[in-house]
Amino acid sequence: RGLGDVYKRQVLDKADIVILEVNENLPWVYGGLDECIHIDDVDMIVEGPHDPLPSIQTPPASEAETRIAEFVVENMDDGATLQLGIGSLPNAVGQMLAQSDLRDLGIHTEMLCDCYLDMYRAGKITNKRKDIDRYKSVFGFAIGSEDLYDWVRENPGVVTYPISYCNAPSTVRNIENFVSINNCISVDLYGQICAESAGTRQISGTGGQLDFLEGAAVSPGGKAFICLTSTFTDKQGEMVSRITPLLNPGDIVTDPRSLAYYIVTEYGGVNLVGCSTWERAERLISVAHPKFRDELVEHARQQGIWIRSNKR
């Protein structure tokens, strides 16, 4: 048992030959479900020296990411159970939570990173209000610094579960006040979310983002925040809006508009739950970069979705 359970049982059940490699540098981590294999089911064991585990440092948050994190933290409550995605922006949320007045937070996440350790050291993580796995921080895999690896080592309060458990909406729905915080690349005026490609260029996989949005939607008191800076600079040095009239050709829809909850940029956050198509457009334009708002309004008119929300 190392830094994650992930899909081990599913892979082992499908394998014709099972070879285990012993890595003396991996921390021994407690597991919560199907984390063991009987020696009779193993065909070969390989031992030998290994390089030290990679230590990954998250880059510091930008000013825009810090403002996004402030909005997210302001809209959280004591006793929330957290899932943070990958990158500097969710990490900024975690670091801000560590300095906040919030109490009795819990962890139920796919990826465990250093910001959770920051929150734990600040006394924010107790897991005492969780409805399942109480007093335990649940994760799928851990990646970060040596300090993080030391924290999870033989720690009965930090346990790894397979993705089929920790990511499953059927699991998350049983956690009251579950809060999901993730990045994306772009959002269109309908609320469709792209978090894995720029056009046809693949940047990442779907990961657990959609799972956790579905889970947060059915968690009592649950919330989901999709965060993005309002613009990026392209190869020609031009500023480009991440909030677009329509997703660009080839953009992959990671999350359908029906699951969009809070969309947050450095200009604020908007709640899209229950909004009509034109209300979504109006709210999303309000958190776009000011330079692009008039242009987005004109596109919304052309698409037939620019109607003020007080006109139904």
Model-derived features: positions:
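Small/polar-residue-rich loop-to-helix segments that shape phosphate-bearing ligand pockets
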Residues: N25-T66
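Extended hydrophobic packing segments that form well-structured cores
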Residues: L259-R312
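Gly/Ser/Thr-rich active-site loops/lids in small-molecule metabolic enzymes
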Residues: K8-D16, S100-D118, A195-I226, P290-E295
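C-terminal catalytic subdomain
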Residues: N177-V264, V270, E279
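Short, small-residue-biased leader/transition segments that mark boundaries at the very start
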Residues: G2-Y7
